[in-house]
């Protein structure tokens, strides 16, 4: 089993030894409740770095709903066993007070790319993400950091953060891992009922159909309206957004030109699912 480090001092001592030996360090930031998507990130890190740290921290600052924070699954022992199978070198699993000690007063906010979509529906969420990620990069002194493309907007926020603050870490986006029926892997999926789980792939199917329609000449507004209607018809309670945006800055796209990204968030069984695909 990989050692589970609880304090910044322990983590820094370990990393200092690695750096002194000239070894490269990769970090995979997670909130635990690990699944094959997370493990694919850890394997990618394992393949390209001498040392791999996986962080497990349910970050209270990125939840704007206290009930959501309370319900988030915490499965540390199971997570550590999964990470042992990948061969990670250390797990950093601090308590909230280790990351945000008494008197903590700094907030990192990335303007622009963080504001639409998730940013509009979850105020403060990306400030919480940017703040904890900036701290984790400082704590781990990582050379490379690995993030899933499933959280595309988060990936764009982190890339902007690193560029703007000259943080010396390379960000690697890794392809979304999906179930055989297309559903993107997510720690939230385990909260779906059996019926909800069967209906859940309708989200990505509607997105794929919209992408195909737009490539075939259907107008963007029409294709998106049809996709939203299809998601609701499949039994989803709400669609927060289903939009076509530029891939990098997430600006609205009125028609297909250049690299686009179709991004969606919808609620099923009271569980909020997000997904995105390239167009």
Curated annotation (Swiss-Prot):
Beta-alanine binds at residue 62. It catalyses: (R)-pantoate + beta-alanine + ATP = (R)-pantothenate + AMP + diphosphate + H(+). The active site is at residue 38. Pfam families: Pantoate_ligase (PF02569). (R)-pantoate binds at residues 62, 154. HAMAP family: PanC. The reaction proceeds by a bi uni uni bi ping pong mechanism. This is Pantothenate synthetase. It comes from Cereibacter sphaeroides (strain KD131 / KCTC 12085) (Rhodobacter sphaeroides).
């Amino acid at each position: 089993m990989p050692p589970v480090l609880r304090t910044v001092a322990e983590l820094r001592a370990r990393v200092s030894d690695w750096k002194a030996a000239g070894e490269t360090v990769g970090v995979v930031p997670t909130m635990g409740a690990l699944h094959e998507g997370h493990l694919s990130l850890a394997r990618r890190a394992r393949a390209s770095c001498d040392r791999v740290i996986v962080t497990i921290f349910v970050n209270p600052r990125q939840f704007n709903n206290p009930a959501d924070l309370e319900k988030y699954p915490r499965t540390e022992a199971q997570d550590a066993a999964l990470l042992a199978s990948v061969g990670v070198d250390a797990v950093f699993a601090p308590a909230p007070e280790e990351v945000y000690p008494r008197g903590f007063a700094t907030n990192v906010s990335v303007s622009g790319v963080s504001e639409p979509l998730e940013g509009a529906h979850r105020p403060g969420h990306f400030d919480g993400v940017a703040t904890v990620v900036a701290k984790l990069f400082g704590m781990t002194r990582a050379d490379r950091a690995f993030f899933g493309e499933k959280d595309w907007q988060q990936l764009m926020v982190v890339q902007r953060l690193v560029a703007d603050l000259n943080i010396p870490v390379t960000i690697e986006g890794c392809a979304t891992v999906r179930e055989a029926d297309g559903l993107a892997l997510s720690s939230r999926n385990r909260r779906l009922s059996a019926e909800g789980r069967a209906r859940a792939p309708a989200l990505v199917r509607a997105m794929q159909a919209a992408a195909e329609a737009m490539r075939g000449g259907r107008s963007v507004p029409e294709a998106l309206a049809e996709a939203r209607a299809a998601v609701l018809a499949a039994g989803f309670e709400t669609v927060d957004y289903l939009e076509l945006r530029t891939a990098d800055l997430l600006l609205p796209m009125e028609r297909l030109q250049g690299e686009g990204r179709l991004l969606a968030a919808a609620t099923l069984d009271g569980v909020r699912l997000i997904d995105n695909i390239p167009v």
